[in-house]
Amino acid sequence: MSNSIVIQTNSTVIEDMKQQYKHSLSPKTPQGGIFMAKVPSCTITAYKSGKVMFQGGRAEAEASRWQTVSQTPKTAVKRSVDSHRYAPPASIGTMSIVGSDEVGTGDFFGPMTVVAVYVDAKQIPLLKELGVKDSKNLNDEQITAIAKQLLHVVPYSSLVLHNEKYNELFDKGNNQGKLKALLHNKAITNLLAKMAPIKPEGVLIDQFTQPDTYYKYLAKQKQVQRENVYFATKGESVHLAVAAASILARYSFVKQFNELSKKAGMPLPKGAGKQVDIAAAKLIQKLGKERLPEFVKLHFANTEKAFRLLK
C-alpha cells in the first residue's frame, strides 16, 4: 500500500510548487484542484483549499521539502545553512541520483571545473569498491587512478572555465557564486540530455550558497533545472554521486593545472598562499604582466601581492 501525506499550506507556496513541478504536470486536475504532478514514486495534488496531497513510495520525502515552508511562522527566524525546502530526503543515499561538485574556486592559478555525475542505486556498491569518497581526502595519484575507472562506469558531464574566460566574465559583474551556479546548472542540464530518456530520482548539488540565491543567479537562463533538485553542504557524504563528481572535477582540474604549468615553463603551486604570490611574481617577470590573465584569477588578493614583490 502506497503512502499518503497531506499538508496544509498557502497560495504562495502552492504557486512555487507548481513552478517547481512544471515539467511533471499532469493534464488532468481533480475537482477543486489547482494542479497534479507526477514525479518518480510520487504524485502531488494541490487543492484550492490549500491542502496538498502526496501519494506514493516517496510521499514522505517529497512532502518534507514543503512542510518547513508551510509551517514557518511569518516572524523572521535565523536558519542554518542546511535548513531550507531543498534539503534532501533521509533516504537519498540509496537513490539513483545526479550529483554535482566544483573544484578550483580557491586556487589562484588554474581554472574552475564543474562535473555532474549520474549514479544508479545499483552502482553504489561498485563505487564504494573503487574507493570513491570526497576528493579532498585523496592525493592526485589516487584521484587519477579512481577517475580513470569512473570515466568508464558512470555517465557524466564535465565543464572547464579557463582563466581568461573566468576573468572576462568576472569583469562583467559575475561574482564567483554566480559563475559556479551557471556551471552547475549547465553540467546538470547537459548530463540529463545525455541520459534521456532515463531520469534520475533527484539531483544533489554540493551546496555553496543558499538555494534561493542559486536560483536568483540563474534568473536569465533559458534552461534551469528545478525538478527534484536538492542542496546539501558536504554533499559527498550525502550521496556517492557528489563524491564521484568531486573526483572527476579534481581529475580534470589536475590535468588542466599540469598543462598550465607546462605553458608557464615552471611549476605552479595550488592554493592561494604565500608560495603562490612568489610564483606569480616569477611568472610576471618571465612572461610579462599582460600574460597573467591566462594563468590566474585576477580578482584574488594574490595579484596585488605578486606585483608588490616585484617593487
From Swiss-Prot:
It is an enzyme of class 3 (hydrolase). A divalent metal cation binds at residues 101-102, 206. Keywords: Cytoplasm, Endonuclease, Hydrolase, Magnesium, Metal-binding, Nuclease. Disulfide bonds: none annotated. The keyword Transmembrane helix does not apply. The keyword Hydrolase applies. It comes from the Bacteria. It catalyses: Endonucleolytic cleavage to 5'-phosphomonoester. SUPFAM superfamilies: Ribonuclease H-like. Its EC number is 3.1.26.4. Manganese or magnesium. Binds 1 divalent metal ion per monomer in the absence of substrate. May bind a second metal ion after substrate binding. It is found in: Cytoplasm. Belongs to the RNase HII family. RnhC subfamily. Endonuclease that specifically degrades the RNA of RNA-DNA hybrids. This is Ribonuclease HIII. It comes from Bacillus cereus (strain AH187). The gene is rnhC.
